[in-house]
A protein has these predicted regions:
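Bacterial N-terminal signal peptides that target proteins for export
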Residues: 1-11
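Residue-level detector of intrinsically disordered/flexible regions characterized by low predicted structural confidence
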Residues: 4, 20-21
């Protein structure tokens, strides 16, 4: 009799476990937006994503990657692409046709381009024309594509003496090498150097670049992606971008 009772309880326990497991397996996994792009806007978008999650309960993971990694990762599990300038999105789309829904592409918050110089501006650099002077050592970041602002003849490197690949490497080079006199870059990078450098703005529309965004074709979370882009257009997001050196 005791054996039969034990067997019955075992059967009931097994049924409960099966029901619980089945219920758990049908639960909808939490929606997570994966946003990929370069390092420059990464920290700003991460701060926006944190506030967006707090307000709307949608988790957004912002991941920075170099171009060759973006080409691999975004088609795999990316929901949104962001760039540091318009040409970056255009280049990605050219290399990876069909990955982005180009009808969703839009250019958000602008960044001013200017010249980072040493504190006190010892060489009295006030514009592009001064970068042509003999003895001015220029830092160039390849991914920023700033050659047109170096004052040199097209096809020549002019006074560029220091070459790095990313903006983060640019910050490091500026701090480690006091022989660098000027770095043509975005105002947002100068925010990290305010205590040790000056920023000379380059005037005009050609010295302003926007932050492009686009939703991927593969995303299963289209509605959430559109909601995040709408949030990035909000006054709250604008305040975050302004704080980090965007215009």
């Amino acid at each position: 009799m005791n054996g039969a009772v034990a067997s019955g309880w075992g059967l009931i326990a097994g049924l409960l476990l099966t029901i619980t497991t089945a219920g758990a397996s049908t639960e909808t996994p939490p929606k997570v937006l994966r946003v990929y792009g370069p390092g420059g806007p990464h920290h700003v978008l991460t701060e926006c994503a944190d506030l967006f999650e707090e307000k709307h309960g949608i988790d957004v993971i912002v991941m920075k990657a170099l171009p060759h990694d973006l080409d691999r990762k975004l088609p795999e599990d990316g929901d949104i692409y962001y760039g540091g300038a318009e040409y970056m999105l255009e280049d990605f789309d050219r290399r990876n046709p069909g990955v982005l829904d180009m009808t969703s592409a839009e250019n958000l918050h602008p960044r001013r381009i200017g010249i980072v110089v040493r504190k006190g501006n010892p060489l009295n650099i006030n514009g592009i024309e001064d970068l042509r002077r003999e003895g001015v050592d220029i830092l160039d970041v390849k991914l920023e594509n700033m050659r047109e602002f170096h004052g040199s003849t097209p096809g020549r490197i002019g006074n560029v003496r220091h070459l790095v690949y990313t903006g983060q490497e640019g910050i490091k080079a500026w701090r480690l090498n006091p022989g660098i006199d000027a770095w043509v870059t975005y105002k947002s990078w100068h925010v990290s150097l305010e205590d040790e450098a000056e920023f000379i703005e380059i005037p005009g529309e050609r010295a302003v670049r926007f932050t492009p965004m686009a939703i991927t074709q593969r995303t299963p979370h289209r509605q959430e992606a559109e909601k995040f882009l709408a949030f990035l257009r909000s006054k709250e997001a604008r305040h975050i971008f302004l704080k980090h050196g965007w215009d």
